[in-house]
Regions:
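Beta-loop-alpha module in the N-terminal Rossmann-like domain of NAD(P)-dependent dehydrogenases
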Residues: 5, 33-98
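Mid-domain beta-loop-alpha active-site segment that forms a flexible
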Residues: 107-114, 144-176
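N-terminal Rossmann-like dinucleotide-binding module
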Residues: 1-34, 48
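Contiguous beta-strand/loop segments that form the cofactor/metal-binding neighborhood of enzyme cores
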Residues: 159, 163-237, 269-276
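A contiguous active-site-proximal alpha/beta segment in oxidoreductase catalytic domains
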Residues: 46-49, 85-145
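C-terminal helix-rich "cap/oligomerization" subdomain common to oxidoreductases
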Residues: 18-19, 31-32, 51-59, 69-70, ...
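Hydrophobic residues in well-ordered beta-strands that form the structural core
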Residues: 80-81, 104-106, 232
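Active-site loop of classical SDR/Rossmann-like NAD(P)-dependent oxidoreductases
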Residues: 24-25, 232, 256-270, 281
Length: 299
């Protein structure tokens, strides 16, 4: 993710400093981006050069909360923190305690996809969401994510699957009356391997979801209004079906930025730099969401 942010910042011609921990990762970053990295970790950089006014935190998931906390302790006023912000509610609450008046946003970049923006426009035109469904099966077939630490694998629903859940509830509303079930287990994810649930959101929409990490499948979201069905499968694309027909048409999108950069990251980063992003997931919102994710995951 750090490379994705660097590509956007370079295109926006924004000055920035890159801070990393180890020589190997720093060398790989420099080789890929041409940008020098200050090694030694964020604490060392803060002591030597002082706090920045803004910070983007794109470290490994198990280091997110500690890194954000170190920045907030020195008075950084605004932080864009990679999703999910931490490995659970406890870590997010600790960030909240250290944030004070600082603004912390959780970087769920799918809120900024061109497909999502067009869906928001079309849904509003239709009069709002009546119901929605989403699939959170990991693909390909929930292969063990060996590239991350075991502690992250054990919380993979938060670290990875929460991306699609956030998108679904962002469009359809927050769950207020709902129930869920989970069962099974994987060797690397003991919490559960199968997930299902349904309920009602604060917008009045009904919803349901399902995921089976031991079966074929992939992420998808389907949003229903009184006149259309909007389908994200894959999430970067949008299809629409009208009432009275079972045919679906691909919606034309102005997705040049999503194709030139990591999808959603350009618009998300630009909105963060400008301030006051109405689409961002605030820290307080994520703390509430995390309780939902942990219940869904069976943690």
């Amino acid at each position: 993710m750090a490379r994705a942010y660097a590509a956007v910042l370079d295109d926006l011609e924004v000055g920035y400093m890159v801070v990393g921990r180890g020589d190997r990762s720093a060398a790989a970053f420099t080789s890929a981006t041409g940008r020098a990295v200050r090694v030694g970790g964020v604490e060392s950089a803060l002591c030597e050069v002082g706090p920045p006014s803004l910070a983007i935190v794109a470290v490994s998931v198990d280091q997110l909360s500690d890194t954000a906390g170190a920045l907030l302790d020195t008075g950084v006023s605004r932080v864009l923190l990679e999703k999910p912000g931490g490995l659970g509610s406890v870590e997010l609450t600790r960030i909240r305690e250290r944030a004070g008046s600082a603004e912390v946003s959780i970087a769920y970049n799918r809120r900024h996809y061109a497909s999502t923006g067009e869906a928001r426009r079309l849904i509003a035109r239709d009069g709002g969401v009546t119901s929605f469904a989403f699939e959170l099966t990991e693909w390909p077939n929930a292969m063990e994510p060996v590239q991350v630490a075991p502690v992250v694998r054990r919380r993979w629903f938060l670290a990875q699957t929460s991306h699609v859940v956030d998108l679904a509830f962002h469009l359809g509303g927050r769950p207020v009356d709902w129930s869920c079930h989970s069962s099974g287990a994987l060797e690397w994810h003991a919490g559960a391997a199968r997930f299902s649930g349904s309920g009602l959101t604060d917008s009045g929409a009904t919803f349901g979801y399902h995921g089976d990490w031991e079966a074929p499948g992939r992420w998808s979201v389907e949003i229903l209004t009184r006149s259309h069905r909007y389908v994200f499968r894959p999430l970067e694309e949008l299809r629409v079906g009208a009432l009275g027909t079972d045919e679906q048409a691909v919606v034309e999108l102005d997705d040049r930025l999503d194709r030139s950069f990591k999808p959603g990251v350009y618009c998300e980063t630009r909105a963060f730099l400008d301030g006051g992003d109405p689409l961002s997931c605030s820290l307080d919102e994520q703390i509430e969401n995390m309780a939902v994710y942990e219940k869904m995951a069976g943690y």
